[in-house]
């Protein structure tokens, strides 16, 4: 791996240098939140955001930035590429917000939705950008390989809870994956089982 730069330390230190705001939190997104072209305006406008993308390219030893900005979309959506792309674009957003003064107070909390937890760790100074990019790329590759061996999918179920929810997924091969909110859960499993669970949920 290339020698670590001071970029991630610089981002965390700039955050810590701002006044702490107990009412402020940052939540970083997970997989599924990316599209071709996302972050290009930040890359063009803010040197610190550009450095985030360029550093990710160096760590991965392939032009992630070009894939993010030009696609093709199908290749970007592969889990092996989508995960480092989302991490990088999210950190570029943070860098731009610090550089242009939009983020002037230190959040009391930083968190992430699934993959976004890695971004939060970098923002908090607990993990370097380089290590995060490397870990997330490996994570994405392993998840991609697993999904190719045994195809699966996920679905959000809205408005069901308690016994009604139990009846949708119990014994079906579908598992509860995330509690997004009191009224929304995510289920996952084999494609056919998730499709059947989604059908049952729509009937309720």
Sequence positions of predicted segments:
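Alpha-helix C-terminal capping segments
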Residues: 96, 100, 121-126
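Gly/Ala-rich beta-loop-alpha elbow adjacent to hydrolase catalytic centers
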Residues: 90, 108-116, 120, 128
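Short, conserved glycine- and acidic-residue-centered signature motifs
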Residues: 83, 116, 190
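An amphipathic alpha-helix/helix-turn recognition signal
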Residues: 51, 85, 114-115, 127, ...
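Helix-rich "cap/lid" substructures immediately adjacent to catalytic or cofactor-binding pockets
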Residues: 2, 8-111, 187
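A short acidic, glycine/proline-enriched capping/turn motif at secondary-structure boundaries
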Residues: 93, 117-118, 141-142
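Alpha/beta catalytic cores of group-transfer enzymes, especially the acyltransferase/condensing modules
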Residues: 31-33, 60, 123-204
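Short, glycine/charge-rich beta-strand/loop segments that flank catalytic centers
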Residues: 73-74, 109-115, 140, 152-156
């Amino acid at each position: 791996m290339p020698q670590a730069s001071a970029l991630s330390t610089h981002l965390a230190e700039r955050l810590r240098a701002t006044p702490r705001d107990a009412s402020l939190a940052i939540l970083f997104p997970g997989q599924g939140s990316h599209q071709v072209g996302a972050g290009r305006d930040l890359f063009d406008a803010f040197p610190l955001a550009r450095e985030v993308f360029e550093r990710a390219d160096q760590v991965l030893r392939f032009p992630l930035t070009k894939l993010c900005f030009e696609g093709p979309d199908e290749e970007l959506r592969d889990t092996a590429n989508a995960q480092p792309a989302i991490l990088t674009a999210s950190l570029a957003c943070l860098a731009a917000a610090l550089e242009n003064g939009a983020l002037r107070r230190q959040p009391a909390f930083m968190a992430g939705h699934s993959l976004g937890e890695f971004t939060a760790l970098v923002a908090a100074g607990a993990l370097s950008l380089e290590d995060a990019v490397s870990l997330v790329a490996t994570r994405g590759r392993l998840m991609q390989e697993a999904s190719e061996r045994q195809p699966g999918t996920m679905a959000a179920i809205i408005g069901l809870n308690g016994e009604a929810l139990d009846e949708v997924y119990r014994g079906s091969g579908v598992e509860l994956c995330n509690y997004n909110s009191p009224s929304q859960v995510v289920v996952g499993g084999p494609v056919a089982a998730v499709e059947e669970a989604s059908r049952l949920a729509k009937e309720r």
